[in-house]
Amino acid sequence: MFDPLLEKLHSSIRIQGGETAAVPDGLRECRNEKKNSWIRSWLWQVPGFRRWRVSRLDAGESLQVLNSVAYPNYNIDQPLMGLDLLWFGKRQKLVAILDFQPLIQDQSYLERHFQGLKTLQNRFPELSGEETMRLFDPNQYFSPWLLFCRGGAEKATNSLPEAFNAFLHCYWELHQQNSDKASLIPAAEVKQLQIAYDIYSAERDPAHGLFTSHFGKAWSDRFLHEFLFPASTKADSSPPADADDDLPR
């Protein structure tokens, strides 16, 4: 379902000078033969970004997932890029969230960085996230203009690909704009804000239970704290585990 979008994302990263980086040992890929599911992840080094991670989960007709978060360099105060795409094939249900995730909720910060996303929300009114903001804490890492898509196969094959491409283009444009001007938030503060994002997200990640059900607790704990949110407070507390040792039976 999401392989064309995954290739589009990777292609756009390569065009911007991105090169693949090493994923922590044992976290590059994991499989559950019993559930016929697998997850594969990539880490990218991209000019202007501290890290850019991508993950793709394939559980057949049960579930398809594409997730990515981009962390700009500390000397750039632009929002993080976050996307979560989920397809439940048996129910023919799509859930997609695409957002520029703000470091702070200050009005002047939002005005500086979110004009492009505002335009996209107007361009794709069917993806307006206004009604879904009740699902998220509006004061923590979500913007008022996130793109939210929930629907069936028609949206998955028509609305989503066009919005996905426009979203990526918009974020690259924002990055180019920020590369040409000074950041208004000091680099040391941006670093602390990105660390706070990892801590907040690791504590609340709704996908952790999903990963655990497919790939076991030990592997999923490592994945959460060593790959998804490595700056979280528990990053060094999870012992190494063999990916095959803790699969659910």
Swiss-Prot record:
Question: One Pfam family of this protein, by short name?
Answer: Fe_bilin_red
Q: Which UniProt keywords apply?
A: Oxidoreductase
Spell out the reaction equation it catalyses.
15,16-dihydrobiliverdin + oxidized 2[4Fe-4S]-[ferredoxin] = biliverdin IXalpha + reduced 2[4Fe-4S]-[ferredoxin] + 2 H(+)
* EC code(s) of this entry: 1.3.7.2
Report the record's Gene Ontology biological process terms.
phytochromobilin biosynthetic process
HAMAP family linked: PebA
UniProt record similarity statement: Belongs to the HY2 family.
Q: What does this protein do?
A: Catalyzes the two-electron reduction of biliverdin IX-alpha at the C15 methine bridge.
Q: Which NCBIfam families match?
A: PRK13247.1
State what protein this is by name: 15,16-dihydrobiliverdin:ferredoxin oxidoreductase
